[in-house]
Amino acid sequence: IEQLGEGKEAIQAIGDIPYINKKWLDCLGLEIPTTVDELEQVLIAFRDNADKIQEECGVEGDVIPMSFITNNGDQDPAILINGFGEGYGDTGDHFAVTDEGEVIYTAVQEGYKEGIQWLHHLVEEDLVDPEAFTQEWSTYVAKGKNHRYGLCFTWDIANIDNYDDYVMLPALAGPDGLVNITRQNNSETSGFDRGRCVLTTSCRNTALAAAWIDQMYAPLQSVQNNWGTYGEEDKPNIFELSENAEGGTMLKHEDLGDNSPVEVREAQSVNGPLAVLNDYYDVYVTQPDDAKWRLDNMHETYLDDMNSKYVYPNVFMSIEDTNKVSQYDTDIKKYAEQMKASWILNGGIEEEWDEYLQKMEDYGLSDYLAIKQKYFDQYQASLGEQ
């Protein structure tokens, strides 16, 4: 569990935040776009004024109006299409829940189709990084560090470029004026995750192992499992050992300077079982500056447009249903994401849509949705019993 805010205010509510280059906007005398049409015009301006941007904004290499990594979690551009059709866009796992409590698959909705058509139009206009469909994280970051992006997508812009030049792009009104942010599924359970640690039958001393696992939930240990540690020489550290206002031991986040927060964290954190609760902050650990920056800006930019009542929760399924879902996810998600990338890059969604829907059914989408619906209903019923 990693808590930082709750409900719609949880830091996990949005993963793939679009960051637009405010330095470039100012250079060209442009306002932050608020509609999909305005964004397209801004991207065109970035493309058509590449020489001016390169000269005045310190760009190393060709100007790239928009870049992303297709089907790559927080680096995917799906948040841009939330204003199309029904307003669900496309979540990371492709599920959403209507305000009536119906579980749907985002990648078979009409609004999704319209949004993908629009993204392909941006490709046709030469506004999208040609490598967006094949690049690895390291390539994506390297181009960002050379200040080449007008618009990019990630959890924290400091992982790609810097805080000074970028602002969060607000939720865009679609063709009919609809504005919505579809929150990430599981986000209301504060990063709750299952399977961080497993005791197998081959464990020779289960009592000792269980006692060791229990220590992973000690506050000072959990925050290190989650973020990283302190005192390592000749390398960036996440923390320094400090004291809270009461004189107790507290881990204080270090200033990482030009180091990427995610790269330092990945080098030091061990993950595994952990719990970081809201009431730990300023008692056992400081709130990290990058997370506070993200959370404050996320609330200011997106909170009012998080219109959906539900997200799909983190649920425990029977072994039988878990196995079924695993197989469905392999077939259905793989096919959906393969076609999504193809349609954004090459077009053809209108002509291939009916065949696509039929193939999704052949893969078992209706049964997949029925299983997900059953556990959503059980979860909602359990809330009423509390």
Regions found by a protein language model. Name each.
Residues 89-108, 170, 178-182, 367-386:
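Extended hydrophobic/aromatic segments used for targeting, binding, or gating
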Residues 187-192:
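Mobile gating loops/cap/lid regions near enzyme active sites that modulate substrate access
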Residues 211, 219-342, 347:
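Conserved small-residue motifs centered on glycine
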Residues 160-184:
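Ligand-binding "clamshell"
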Residues 43-47, 57-96, 143, 148-168:
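Carboxylate/His-rich catalytic cores and anion/metal-binding grooves
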Residues 338-386:
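Histidine-centered catalytic/metal-binding microenvironments
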Residues 105-115, 323-339, 370, 374-377:
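Short, 15-30-residue, compositionally biased linear elements
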Residues 1-75, 97-143, 199-232, 351:
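Helix-loop-helix "hinge/cap" segment bordering the ligand-binding cleft or interdomain interface
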